[in-house]
UniProtKB/Swiss-Prot annotation:
The keyword Transport does not apply. Belongs to the adenylosuccinate synthetase family. Keywords: Cytoplasm, GTP-binding, Ligase, Magnesium, Metal-binding, Nucleotide-binding, Purine biosynthesis. It catalyses: IMP + L-aspartate + GTP = N(6)-(1,2-dicarboxyethyl)-AMP + GDP + phosphate + 2 H(+). This is Adenylosuccinate synthetase.
């Protein structure tokens, strides 16, 4: 039995979707439970050359034996969820998704409020998905819950019971986080943050398990960190430099161009401390050194790539255990 939490180490877009899907294929967890704020974060998963962008369904969906749970701490957009269930029907999603009875539900009024608020949309750079206003209503105890919506009835369940019973039965559980620690309402660069905490502790709470149940915390870092929206970015490079390095990316949810920077060892160390990291997953090593593209053996990593990995381990103090060398699941080095 192991309970593993996967958390973003930067401002989101670190490649958590690929890492989570890989771990699901390798470790075969019986339950993949999603924590995080809501549909304001997108994950990209590539399966057999086809790319899927999802915002509600847990990214462990390619593993057909896993139950896919959305914890009570997560906000649900009914339309987004139903569209994803339909989009992923070849993976038998409909019979595997469990939405907690007590998930809060984002309604159209929340999205309108999010988009019309100039402070959120222009100064903060909100995604406009209604999460912030919905969380305000939750705090005011006026937000409607999943159990009140007929469209969600086929998916309803008690996620906390599901996760805890799986662990008690000696099964593997994976808890997937969204966004990144540096967007945390409490530990990020306030006010340029999301509307809730995005640390490993928060994700455990979102799905209803206590801290003593967690065995592993894997923090995901991208070799070149990115950020969508406003806010400080200490190691940000200019657009010309990013283009010269071939680093042009766009957000899964907003479609906005991502700001790109150099790896920040000091912030990485702080993030690992905040999350109690037991391991690091490093993505886009092939962007740092294109000769590493597609590698699956640690001993084949180039001198340049290996030096980068060793520098991270020395300066951050946490071992790099999973390395992504391309978008496909098999383009991964795993030394856990």
């Amino acid at each position: 039995m192991t309970c593993t939490i996967v958390v973003g180490g930067q401002w989101g877009d670190e490649g958590k979707g690929k890492i989570i899907s890989y771990i699901c294929e390798k470790d075969k967890p019986s339950v993949v439970a999603r924590g995080g704020v809501g549909p304001n974060a997108g994950h990209s998963v590539e399966v057999d050359g086809k790319k899927y962008g999802i915002r509600m369904v847990p990214t462990g969906f390619p593993n057909r034996s896993s139950k896919l749970a959305v914890g009570a701490g997560v906000l649900v957009d009914v339309d987004v969820l139903l569209k994803e269930v339909e989009m992923l029907k070849e993976f038998n999603i409909k019979d595997r998704v469990i939405i907690d009875y007590n998930c809060g539900v984002i309604e159209e009024k929340h999205k309108e409020m999010d988009k019309s608020n100039s402070h959120l949309s222009k100064e903060i750079g909100s995604t406009g998905t209604g999460c912030g206003p919905a969380n305000v209503d939750r705090a005011m105890r006026t937000l409607r819950l999943a159990k009140e919506f007929d469209a969600l009835k086929p998916f309803l369940g008690d996620v906390s019971d599901l996760v805890n019973e799986a662990l008690e039965n000696g099964e593997n559980v994976l808890i997937e986080g969204t966004q990144g620690t540096l967007l945390s309402l409490y530990y990020g660069s306030y006010p340029y943050v999301t509307s809730n905490d995005t640390s490993a502790s928060a994700f455990a709470s979102d799905v209803g398990i206590g801290p003593t149940k967690v065995d592993e915390v894997i923090v995901v870092f991208k070799s070149y960190p990115t950020r969508v929206g406003e806010g400080p970015f200490p190691t940000e490079m200019d657009v010309e430099e990013a283009e010269k390095l071939g680093l042009v990316e766009y957000g899964t949810v907003t479609g906005r161009r991502r700001r790109i920077g150099y790896f920040d060892y000091d912030l990485a160390k702080k993030v690992c401390r905040l999350n109690g990291a037991t391991a690091i997953a490093l993505t886009c090593l092939d962007k740092y050194d294109e000769e590493c593209h597609g590698l699956t053996n640690y001993d084949d990593i180039t001198e340049k790539g290996l030096a980068f990995i060793k520098e991270i381990e020395e300066k951050v103090g946490v071992p790099v255990k999973i390395i992504s060398t391309g978008p496909e699941l098999h383009q991964t080095i795993d030394i856990r």
